[in-house]
Structure formats: C-alpha cells, structure tokens
C-alpha cells in the first residue's frame, strides 16, 4: 500500500496482508486500479459467496437502504421473524439465533450448550470439542479453542 515504505499503516498488524489492493469486483473477480483482474479464491473468507457487484443483491440492498438501514433487536422486525420461521421450517427447528459473525456464532453455541446442560442439572457436560487447524474468532474464549499460536 505504501510504496515508499516510509509510511506505516495505522492498522494493527493482525493480518499478513498482500501488497495489493482492489478498486472493484465483478462476480468472482477482483480488479485493481490498473485494470488487472484476479480470481477471488478467498471470497472475503466466505462472506462474498455470491460474488461481487451482483445485480440482484445490489438492487435489493439499495431498495432496503431507501426504507430502513438498521433496526435494533430491541424492537420487533417482521422480516426477521419471517426469515426465522422459514429457517425453522427448513431445518425442523423451534428457534434460530441471528448474529453478525462466526465469532458470535461460536460464542453463542458455547453459551447455549452450557445453559442447556446447566438447566438440566447436567453439570458434568462441560467439555467443548474444537476442530484442529481451524480459526474460531478473536475473543479470549475462541482463541483458547484455537490451536494455532499465530492468532
């Protein structure tokens, strides 16, 4: 990013970033200011699985942004209820939990499992299995679950 190397980034160095940046994306391609195209194998670590600049998604986001940008979970959100109902129907579940990231999902899974067994007086059910060579998030609990010292 800084060609003269005299400047330093103001970002904490928690990523080993490649010395390249992109101006835009189309589908599965990332494009530099010079017009060089790179196939996006990382897809934003799975957050861009539908590709970049998808017309259907862009139109839906613009339409929603003209109505409401964000509503706190302190209020009822009819669309959220509808999606929850659909997910429960597809997965044969009673409830779902929406969150913003894998970290929040992992933290919630641990808390929900602990609460469930605590409520059943199964205090011996306190072992949490973790996947080797996986990244679970940067909270203290999830870092403890990660076997990679790099994190």
Model region roles, listed by residue range:
Residues 42-43, 144:
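Short clusters of small/polar residues that mark proteolytic maturation junctions
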Residues 31-32:
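Hydrophobic alpha-helical segments, especially N-terminal targeting/anchoring helices
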Residues 38, 44-74, 78, 84-100:
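Glycine-rich phosphate-binding segment of PLP-dependent enzymes
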Residues 86-151:
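PLP-dependent aspartate aminotransferase-fold enzymes
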Residues 1-26, 43, 74:
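Active-site-adjacent loop/helix segments that line or gate small-molecule/cofactor pockets in enzymes
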């Amino acid at each position: 990013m800084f060609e003269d190397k005299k400047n330093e980034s103001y970002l904490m160095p928690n990523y080993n970033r490649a010395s390249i940046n992109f101006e835009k994306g189309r589908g599965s391609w990332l494009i530099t200011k010079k017009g060089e195209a790179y196939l996006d194998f990382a897809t934003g670590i799975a957050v861009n699985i539908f590709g970049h600049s998808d017309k259907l998604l862009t139109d839906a986001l613009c339409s929603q942004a003209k109505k409401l940008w964000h509503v706190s979970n302190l209020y009822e959100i009819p669309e959220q209820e509808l999606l929850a109902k659909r997910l429960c129907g597809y997965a044969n579940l009673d409830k779902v939990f929406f969150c913003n990231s894998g970290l929040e999902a992992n933290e919630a899974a641990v808390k929900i499992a602990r609460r469930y067994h605590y409520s059943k007086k199964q205090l011996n059910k306190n072992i949490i299995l973790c996947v080797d060579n996986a990244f679970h998030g940067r909270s203290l609990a999830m870092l403890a679950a990660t076997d990679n010292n790099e994190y």
